[in-house]
From Swiss-Prot:
Keyword tags: Cell membrane, Cell projection, Chromophore, Disulfide bond, G-protein coupled receptor, Glycoprotein, Membrane, Phosphoprotein, Photoreceptor protein, Receptor, Retinal protein, Sensory transduction, Transducer, Transmembrane, Transmembrane helix, Vision
Residue segments, region Disordered: 354-381
Residue ranges annotated as Extracellular topological domain: 1-53, 116-130, 194-217, 305-311
UniProt xrefs under SMART domains: 7TM_GPCR_Srsx
UniProt-listed PANTHER family: OPSIN
Compositionally biased region (Polar residues): 354-370
CDD domains to which the protein is assigned, alphabetical: 7tmA_photoreceptors_insect
Protein name: Opsin-1
MF-aspect GO terms: G protein-coupled receptor activity; photoreceptor activity
Disulfide bond residue pairs: 127-204
Residue ranges that the UniProt entry lists as topological domain Cytoplasmic: 79-90, 151-169, 246-280, 337-381
């Protein structure tokens, strides 16, 4: 009885009816009339998506949203309330968690609602707002990661000769990140490109299908300043970070050989080891960001350069990978951050990972020790 009722639902009967599984319907048929002016003619050639895809997408986005909000919320809480973690460098970590938190807090529920109705039902204004939030917090995340990479470059490559980051300079960088992000993401509201429904009709994003150069130029310039430039800066920073780490390890091996000892670990060497651990954590986070957002960039470039036909199902994966990125960061820090794990165990014993024996060699505390020491020296001078 239940199965008969399910099969008789309009979405299922529409999907299975007619030639090829569709009764002359398109993916646009369920779109409310007030939204049609935003829908590109490209999408009218595609039949409705299988309702199971909408159900699967809604479920996955819901799960990712819960994990991201809880995970990033805990990162913000623990880094903000644990004294040993309240350092200038970790202000950037908190800002990254804040951006990821807001990404899923503002986007998972609307997408879940639209997946239930199998189309965008929240109106044109919410479509623009949804797309703006996705662009804003995505931009905020990558530029925060860029600032983290530059901070690691400053500490690891330049070492004690570098000017330490203070709370003031960290806050100025965070202010720049958000001012820069807002400036780029409000442009489509003023006519440089626009925010429109994606092909699956349950999410909204930039218009990469309109063929005029006003729209195309925004995608190209935005991609440079919000993707390629920060990515290039990150690669540049980590290239020299890895060079410095390699040179340090080579120096340590030669010193051990000369002194004929199995192990040589001075306080400075332990400090550098902690710096290297943080560099690996940050590099892992950035790699996950790269794999999360690159599919969406490829979809945008495919649209403006017409290299292949973009299907509604393809746009689902672009949206999904981009939003999943907001889940990665708290997991990475939870696994690889001893001091974070120690604070997590203290504040949330039932949720904590098993504490490791090297909690005193925290990646975060090690990462900022050099900066703190330089601050003290400059103050005493």
């Amino acid at each position: 009885m239940a199965s008969a009722s399910l099969i008789s639902e309009p979405s299922f009967s529409a999907y299975w009816g007619g030639s090829g599984g569709f009764a002359n319907q398109t993916v646009v048929d369920k779109v409310p009339p007030e939204m049609l002016y935003l829908v590109d003619p490209h999408w009218y050639q595609f039949p409705p998506m299988n309702p199971l895809w909408h159900g699967l997408l809604g479920f996955v986005i819901g799960v990712l949203g819960v994990i991201s909000v809880i995970g990033n919320g805990m990162v913000i809480y623990i880094f903000s309330t644990t004294k040993s973690l309240r350092t200038p460098s970790n202000l950037l970590v908190v800002n990254l968690a804040f951006s990821d938190f807001l990404m899923m807090f503002t986007m998972s529920a609307p997408m879940g609602i639209n997946c239930y109705y199998e189309t965008w039902v929240l109106g044109p204004f919410m479509c623009e707002l949804y797309a703006l939030f996705g662009s804003l917090f995505g931009c905020g995340s990558i530029w925060t990661m860029t600032m983290i990479a530059l901070d690691r470059y400053n500490v690891i490559v330049k070492g004690l000769s570098a000017k330490p980051m203070t709370n003031k300079t960290a806050m100025l960088r965070i202010l720049f990140i958000w001012a820069f992000s807002v400036a780029w993401t409000i442009m489509p509201l003023f006519g440089w490109n626009r925010y429109v429904p994606e092909g699956n009709m349950t999410a909204c994003g930039t218009d990469y299908l309109t063929k005029d150069w006003v729209s195309r130029s925004y995608i190209l310039v935005y991609s440079f300043f919000v993707y390629l430039l920060p990515l290039g800066t990150i690669i540049y920073s980590y290239f020299f970070i890895l060079q410095a780490v390699s040179a340090h390890e080579k120096q340590m091996r030669e010193q051990r050989k000369k002194m004929n000892v199995a192990s040589l670990r001075s306080a400075e060497a332990s400090q550098t080891s902690a710096e290297c651990k943080l560099a690996k954590v940050a590099l892992m986070t950035i790699s996950l960001w790269f794999f999360g957002w690159t599919p969406y960039l490829i979809i945008n470039f495919t649209g403006i350069f017409e290299t292949m036909k973009i299907s509604p199902l393809l746009t689902i994966w672009g949206s999904l990978f981009a939003k999943a990125n907001a889940v990665f960061n708290p997991i990475v820090y939870g696994i690889s951050h001893p001091k974070y794990r120690a604070a997590l165990e203290k504040k949330f014993p039932s949720l904590a990972c098993a504490s490791s024996s090297d909690d005193n060699t925290s990646v975060a505390s090690g990462a900022t020790t050099v900066s703190d020491e330089k601050s003290e020296k400059s103050a005493s001078a």
